[in-house]
Amino acid sequence: MTTTEAPSALSFECETGNYHTFCPISCVAWLYQKIEDSFFLVIGTKTCGYFLQNAMGVMIFAEPRYAMAELEEGDISAQLNDYAELKRLCTQIKRDRNPSVIVWIGTCTTEIIKMDLEGLAPKLEAEIGIPIVVARANGLDYAFTQGEDTVLAAMAARCPEAATSEADQQERTNAIQRLLQFGKSPAAEQQPASSKHPPLILFGSVPDPVATQLTIELAKQGITVSGWLPAKRYTELPVIAEGSYAIGLNPFLSRTATTLMRRRKCKVIGAPFPIGPDGSRAWIEKICSVLEIEPQGLAEREAQVWDSIEDYRQLVEGKQVFFMGDNLWEISLARFLVRCGMRCPEIGIPYLDRRYLGAELAMLEATCQSMGVPLPRLVEKPDNYNQLQRIEALQPDLVITGMAHANPLEARGISTKWSVEFTFAQIHGFGNARAILELVTRPLRRNLALGTLGGSQWVSEAVTSR
């Protein structure tokens, strides 16, 4: 019998499996709502249309601000003129919806037939007078949430380098201040002026309540957010001047970070992501450190949040969680759950950018060591067959997985949680730590309830009889 020692450092593997994730064109689901004056045109086949219709559940009569440009046999065999067809569609969009920007979303089919969307867009943009942003979100090269990354990287190149005037810059700042002061009494508006520091851009799409919470948390430290990418309106894209600071909110935005560094000459701040009270504190502390501001009250704020989620921590303490890999949130979630007392033997992830995730990886390692649990094994592009064998051997208490594997695992008596739920939930910042544990513990609480009713015996008998 051989014994295996726990690794003293994070181990990285790549199994070169397929991308078993949601299609990245699903980014349209949240981006078209976030950018209120946009219109998304997905250029693909009927399969893409069926996916969007079913995944987003928006009925036709709701007139959503996205549409499908369905490729037909004539397009694939080059019998039709791509420019003429796209011009017809974009002219109709301009007439019916008049958006401030049209975003073309490329798919697998446009990649395979080598459709030159980047070449067609500038000519058509000049002709119809509406900006056209091209983003390739095909499932051949990108995982689920990386669709947002390609869109934001394309939009980063469109951000102005300088405000058109001092009055315009003041108006942008005042818009953020008005958002923070909405609903407050005049007396509450008297707050100390923020410290002078270089411009700070936050990039990553989050719901408006989360954006407000994070802006307020930074304002408490005397930090002013100069702009957001994406902005609520395309016409309000942030000014990105050379030397500006930028920091990401989501772990799947490595291409956007690279674009900001190389093309816009920004200084991208590397920090753990604001997931859980520990990550939120580290995220704010890193910003304060770079801007040379002394953080105030963060330790007390973190302790307060930990106390408020103690009931959920007791539920997960000592439990084992396994990440199969789907939405690139795996490392941040694993770090937070380990801090809550869970053990994580393996983290599968479709794509791993060690440079962009460097601070998060370092914090994961430090968290495991401080909690006295073995370091997880990180597997990039995992092979699902091999993963299933490891899950069968480990028998974890919970597997966080894509929807395709949830029911088969449940049929084998293994509790699961859909990773897609974390994508659409509000999970950033101090105030949403409880929401994460609410999602994670739901199957565990269900098992406890079944055990009380005697249902766990029925489940085990059903699994044994297979």
Swiss-Prot record:
Entry keyword annotation includes Disulfide bond: no
Catalytic reactions of this protein: chlorophyllide a + oxidized 2[4Fe-4S]-[ferredoxin] + 2 ADP + 2 phosphate = protochlorophyllide a + reduced 2[4Fe-4S]-[ferredoxin] + 2 ATP + 2 H2O
Cofactor note: Binds 1 [4Fe-4S] cluster per heterodimer. The cluster is bound at the heterodimer interface by residues from both subunits.
Cofactor(s) this protein requires: [4Fe-4S] cluster
Job description of the protein: Component of the dark-operative protochlorophyllide reductase (DPOR) that uses Mg-ATP and reduced ferredoxin to reduce ring D of protochlorophyllide (Pchlide) to form chlorophyllide a (Chlide). This reaction is light-independent. The NB-protein (ChlN-ChlB) is the catalytic component of the complex.
Protein family (similarity comment): Belongs to the BchN/ChlN family.
Protein name as annotated: Light-independent protochlorophyllide reductase subunit N
The organism of origin for this protein: Synechococcus elongatus (strain ATCC 33912 / PCC 7942 / FACHB-805) (Anacystis nidulans R2)
Gene: chlN
